[in-house]
Each structure stands twice: as structure tokens, then as C-alpha cells.
């Protein structure tokens, strides 16, 4: 079994920079690929990320715009948005060695196809081993070496364990799992719940309402997870409950801050600040997938209706509060 001594990180944004630093701290030989020439040059010359001011790249991290060079690593972290993962995985297919792990680090579901991230990798790069990294982790915390725990999942237990070992450092603790679907499902679902929680906070509905929204959001996550084959222990773990708890409690979460802005009465364009949160794309897809399995998800339904302009925030909240009373699950 490979020790994955060389790791490439594809994507030089905040999360990619944080994971590159983590891999370097874990003693790996790290290459950081960035497609934007201006940002790549800035990283190479200043060693400082525009997205994480004050955070400097380790001297050992090599910055490149050459995808073929990055593809020579023993494992690749794909730190690109969920909706562009397909194009990156397709480009990698002819460049990677057989059975190279491609680890998705985005939390989402592809719009239009309803594909999870590892499904896209399997489809577009059949030579690769699909894997997923997810859990409660903000880029700024990880980059600064603050204690963080995540989950890395692959269908092969030995591969998952080896990848976790390769990324393990004094402050970054990966747990390993073979429940690939459960790990990526939790990360995608919490995006939508975090928007809902942000709306509650932005509307100043109080701590009680926020706690209720987060708890019932977790109920929806579990329902959806069961319908799509996730293990209950995964949903109760870092990539499920852990990520949900974090992202429903702080504006550090882009989805939560997006929801807060909506709750304050801002339009979607105003709330996005030039970059839509991943939950915006996930909400309608999540709802379609839930309906296909007959899963009741009232919070997700309300969020999707708000984002599609079908309901105002107050009407959506009233709709949730006036649903028929029922026994707690």
C-alpha cells in the first residue's frame, strides 16, 4: 500500500491553500495547482494567499499551472467547486496513473445530473480511485494549524486508512471510513440547512428558533441519508452532525452568512456578494432527489422556494410553524 508521499492540491483558493499547508505539515511533498495565471503568479512570488491574508505557504510547496505536473502525484485533492469538478476530473483522466486516488473536497451535488462528487470522478476518470474529504473545517482554522478533525472516505478501507495517515498532522486529525455516500451526503445536505439557519439568525428570531431549525435540519439530513444508503453512524459523525453544527452556528460559513443576508431582507444578488454559496445550487437538487425517494424535507422545501422566488422569508417561516403537529422522530 502506498504511503502517498506526494500529494497535489488542485485549487489555490482558501480551502486548497489550507489543505496544501496541512499536507506539507504532514511531511508530504506538495504541489499546489492553480488555473488562474494571475493568482498562481501571486502565490509563487509572495507565498501568500489572497484569500487568507497573513497565511504563508510553506517553502516546500511547489506552485504550478501545469496540470500534467500536478497529476504525477500519488494522490490528488480536488479542491474545486462542485459544479466544475466534472471538467477537472475529465482533464485529469489521461494524465493520472492507474488507481490514483482523486479526493473530492467540495460539498455539493451536481446540478442537472444529481451526481455526488465521487460519482462524477468514477464517471469521468475511471482509472482513478474516488474518495471524499469532508467534515467541520473552516479554511482559516486549518491554515493556521488550529485543531480540526475530518473524515476521509473511500470504498477500499486500506486506501481510506492510508489517505488519512498521509494527511495526519499534529493539528489535523482525519478519521477514515468506507461510507463514501454517507460522508459526501452529509456535506451536501448541511449546505441547505446552513442557509435556513442563517435566515433564522438574520431575521433575529432568537436562539430557541436557531436551535430548533438546526435540530430539525439534522432530522432531514438523517431521513435523506437513510433513503440514499448512508450509515447512521456516519450521519452522527463529523461529516454529518459535526459539519451541520458548525455551519449552522457562525457567519464564517458562506451558506450561513448567505442565509443571514436573506433573513435581513437582501436580494439573492446582494446576499451572494459576487459568489453564490454552494447551498444555492444544492437546494433544488436536494429537493428533487428527496421527492424521488418520497422523503419529506420541509426545511429544504422552504429554502428552495425562497431561493427560487416562490416564497418570501416570512411566508416560508410561517409555513413551517403552521404545519400539522406530529410526534417527534
Curated annotation (Swiss-Prot):
One of its GO terms (cellular component) is cytosol. Sn-glycerol 3-phosphate binds at residues 107, 135, 137, 190, 243, 253-255. Pathway: Membrane lipid metabolism; glycerophospholipid metabolism. GO terms for biological process: carbohydrate metabolic process; glycerol-3-phosphate biosynthetic process; glycerol-3-phosphate catabolic process; glycerophospholipid metabolic process; phospholipid biosynthetic process. NADPH binds at residues 15, 35, 107, 139, 254, 276, 278. Keywords: Cytoplasm, Lipid biosynthesis, Lipid metabolism, NAD, NADP, Nucleotide-binding, Oxidoreductase, Phospholipid biosynthesis, Phospholipid metabolism. The active site is at 190 (proton acceptor). Its EC number is 1.1.1.94. It is found in: Cytoplasm. HAMAP family: NAD_Glyc3P_dehydrog. This is Glycerol-3-phosphate dehydrogenase [NAD(P)+]. It comes from Rhodopseudomonas palustris (strain BisB5). The gene is gpsA.
